[in-house]
A protein has these predicted regions:
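Regulatory cytosolic signal-relay segments
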Residues: 1-27, 192
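Catalytic NTP-binding/metal-coordinating core of nucleotidyl cyclase/transferase enzymes
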Residues: 18-100
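Helical mechanochemical/support elements of P-loop NTPase systems and associated helical scaffolds
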Residues: 51, 58, 77, 94, ...
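Alpha-helical scaffold within the catalytic cores of cyclic-nucleotide enzymes
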Residues: 55-71, 87-128, 153-154, 159-162, ...
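A short glycine-enriched loop-to-beta-strand structural element that forms part of the catalytic core
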Residues: 83-84, 122-138
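Cytosolic regulatory/linker segments at or just downstream of nucleotide-handling modules
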Residues: 164-222
Length: 222
């Protein structure tokens, strides 16, 4: 008899694969990406062991903002985070919660950045990107390290918006703007007026997208 993976018979291999493969569901949600600006300079100047507690403090502030605003952290890696809002289908698609989380991240990280600048002579800030749309919720990874994550074009666009955002800025797409429907002040009181920016062309994507930003209060070259 021909053996399948790991010496299993073909039938047994199929059964094991089916057991391991969790169901995938689709939903509409708002995806948030955030990353640390100035991280490369930090990592170059400081010993690696000194960077660890700084990243832990940074990611802790981001996770607190996500959880406080009703979202869920799906991925942390290095100096960045991916979170989802409205993934469970409660309270709409999560646009207002995601915007509130982005605003909270900027607000809560500001004193941390000031302290790092004072104590370590390091300039740092956060960039945030938001996009609302359909996502697939699934479990990925080897059997010993599986994790629930979000997949799809919505995730890719949110990540690209985060990369495009300037330090201290929240960028979001037209789908987020439409979902807010003028309720942005209720979602995150104290936000400065939104600015509509020129269309953003994403490499590999057929059409550009309309984008808005919550501008940075202070322009930083990071």
């Amino acid at each position: 008899m021909t053996e399948g993976p790991c010496g299993l018979s073909p039938t047994a291999a199929i059964i094991v694969t089916r057991v391991r493969r969790a169901p995938v569901r689709t939903t509409r949600a708002t995806v948030l990406f955030a990353d640390l600006r100035g991280y490369m300079g930090m990592a170059e100047r400081l010993p690696a062991a000194r960077v660890v507690p700084l990243l832990d403090e940074f990611l802790g502030a981001l996770a607190f903002a996500v959880e406080t605003c009703g979202g869920r952290v799906f991925h942390m890696a290095g100096d960045g985070m991916m979170a989802g809002f409205g993934v469970d289908g409660e309270g709409g698609h999560g646009a207002s919660q995601a915007l509130a989380a982005g605003h909270t991240m900027l607000r809560d990280f500001s004193p941390i950045a000031a302290r790092w600048r004072s104590e370590l002579s390091i300039d740092s800030a956060i960039g945030v990107g938001l996009h609302e749309g359909e996502v697939a919720v699934g479990v990925l990874g080897p059997s010993h390290h599986r994790a629930t994550t979000l997949v799809g074009d919505t995730v890719n666009v949110a990540a690209r918006l985060c990369s495009r955002a300037r330090a201290g800025e929240v960028l979001f797409s037209s789908t987020v703007a439409a979902a807010l429907d003028g309720n942005e002040s209720a979602a995150a009181p104290g936000l400065p007026p939104f600015l509509q920016l020129p269309q953003f062309e994403l490499r590999g994507r057929r059409s550009p997208i309309d984008i808005w930003c919550v501008p940075a209060l202070e322009r930083l070259a990071l």
